[in-house]
From Swiss-Prot:
GO terms for molecular function: chondroitin sulfate binding; heparin binding; Roundabout binding; signaling receptor activity. InterPro entries: Leu-rich_rpt, Leu-rich_rpt_typical-subtyp, LRR_dom_sf, LRR_TM_domain-containing. Identified in a complex that contains RTN4R, RTN4RL1 and NGFR; the interaction depends on the presence of chondroitin sulfate proteoglycans. Does not interact with MAG, OMG and RTN4. Residues 352-366, 401-413 have a biased composition (Basic residues). It is found in: Cell membrane; Membrane raft; Perikaryon; Cell projection. Keywords: Cell membrane, Cell projection, Glycoprotein, GPI-anchor, Leucine-rich repeat, Lipoprotein, Membrane, Receptor, Repeat, Signal, Transmembrane, Transmembrane helix. It comes from Rattus norvegicus. Residues 1-24 form the signal peptide. The keyword Transmembrane helix applies. GO terms for cellular component: cell projection; cell surface; membrane raft; perikaryon; plasma membrane; side of membrane. A lipid is attached at residue 424 (GPI-anchor amidated serine). This is Reticulon-4 receptor-like 1. Detected in brain (at protein level). Expressed in various regions of the brain, including the cerebral cortex, hippocampus, striatum, thalamus and cerebellum.
């Protein structure tokens, strides 16, 4: 039989399990303290459940049937809100007014949302991750990202966006990841990416791009990854890619490239590019159909006229000895950076480059891009959003940085100083032994 004291303790434990934390917890939800977390995902809610504690910092409402958001649904104390995969059709402009602590907002996979008011995200000064993938958006209003100076990750993929106006991202000075793939963009103007001075990854594949302004990437000096595959591009000027001095991964396949004279500047840039790039398959002219633009020779452009003459093209070809000498002066990704370009030199640039050190040990997978990378803290391509791993392919990113071929200078043998005996070889040892025996014989006589 249980003692009276034990029964009281058991009753208290049972009551504690039934009582909601911090003054209340919504029905069918689970709440956790420190930090206050409300988990209500996958419960077929048609509206925001009542009774969410005002001190809630993390709220998880994904995989329900919620249809709209308005002011008063959440407390300004909120830091994280996941409300993806619902049926949201409307977000009141002042829904997040005063949410100065909000850092992560996932509104993705609400396919009937379609439009957003310009002031929807106004004042979210700490927001660092914003998920708007698969929201049925066909356009973005001017100023919608105004003031989001802390934003680092912006996911806009798999919408129906056809056009982006100049300076749409101009306030996103700390943005590192911009995902725009799977939309209907047909052109990139001069000022679309203006201000994105810290952008690291730009994914534009699987759009309908036909034209890119030659200054579209002007501010992207820190970009390392650019995907333009599976578009409708036929031409891309080499000058367009010239500002991308830190670029490491480039994909241009899946376009109908014209490999005639118009491709010459891109061909020249690709010859200088030191990173990893896809094939650039030629669609025209007919005699080059199926060839890789990168494999064409100087002679293929000899009859082209324009700013760059065949003589200028030929000047880029190097002899074997020249290439070996050039490698001695070309810094690798792990070597010292040019002060003017903290993230590396323009691919193929020669002036101002620093000579690498003589240490011939290899860099082992530095800055490797892998599938096992961390989750929400540093989202990779496979981490668009929680429970979203099945919605894309893993094979679009390389698994490691491209290996570079380098030559180590032949080591100069170090000779012993004058007067110091070196380690003897077999012949020298025999001579020394013979001399010692002769000396011994002479002394015995």
């Amino acid at each position: 039989m249980l003692r009276k004291g034990c029964c009281v303790e058991l009753l208290l434990l049972l009551l504690a399990g039934e009582l909601p934390l911090s003054g209340g917890c919504p029905r069918d939800c689970v709440c956790y303290p420190s930090p206050m977390t409300v988990s209500c995902q996958a419960h077929n809610f048609a509206a925001i459940p009542e009774g969410i504690p005002e001190d809630s910092e993390r709220i998880f409402l994904q995989n329900n049937h919620i249809t709209f958001l308005q002011q008063g649904h959440f407390s300004p104390a909120m830091v994280t809100l996941w409300i993806y995969s619902n049926n949201i059709t409307f977000i009141a402009p002042n829904t997040f007014e005063g949410f100065v602590h909000l850092e992560e907002l996932d509104l993705g996979d609400n396919r009937q949302l379609r439009t957003l008011a310009p002031e929807t995200f106004q004042g979210l000064v700490k927001l660092h991750a914003l998920y708007l993938y698969k929201c049925g958006l066909s356009s973005l209003p001017a100023g919608i990202f105004g003031g989001l100076h802390s934003l680092q990750y912006l996911y806009l993929q798999d919408n129906h966006i056809e056009y982006l106006q100049d300076d749409i991202f101009v306030d996103l000075v700390n943005l590192s990841h911009l995902f725009l793939h799977g939309n209907k963009l047909w052109s990139l103007g001069q000022g679309i990416f203006r201000g994105l001075v810290n952008l690291d990854r730009l994914l534009l594949h699987e759009n309908q791009l036909q034209w890119v302004h030659h200054k579209a990437f002007h501010d992207l000096h820190r970009l390392t990854t650019l995907f333009l595959f599976n578009n409708s591009l036929t031409e891309l000027q080499g000058d367009c890619l010239a500002p991308l001095v830190a670029l490491e991964f480039l994909r241009l396949n899946g376009n109908a490239w014209d490999c005639g004279c118009r491709a010459r500047s891109l061909w020249e840039w690709l010859r200088r590019f030191r990173g990893s790039s896809s094939v650039v398959p030629c669609a025209t002219p007919e005699l080059r159909q199926g060839q890789d633009l990168k494999s064409l020779r100087v002679e293929d452009f000899r009859n082209c006229t324009g700013p760059a003459s065949p003589h200028q093209i030929k000047s880029h070809t190097l002899s074997t000895s020249d290439r070996a000498a050039r490698k001695e002066h070309h810094p690798s990704h792990g070597a010292s950076r040019d002060k003017g370009h903290p993230h590396g030199h323009l691919p193929g640039s020669r002036s101002g480059s620093k000579k690498p050190g003589k240490n011939c040990t290899s860099h082992r997978n530095r800055n490797q891009i892998s599938k096992g990378s961390a989750g929400k803290e540093l989202p990779e391509l496979q981490d668009y959003a929680p429970d979203y791993q099945h919605k894309f392919s893993f094979d679009i990113m390389p698994t490691a940085r491209p290996k570079r071929k380098g030559k180590c200078a032949r080591r100069t043998p170090i000779r012993a100083p004058s007067g110091v005996q070196q380690a003897s070889s077999g012949t020298a040892l025999g001579v020394s032994l013979l001399a010692w025996i002769l000396g011994l014989v002479v002394s015995l006589r």
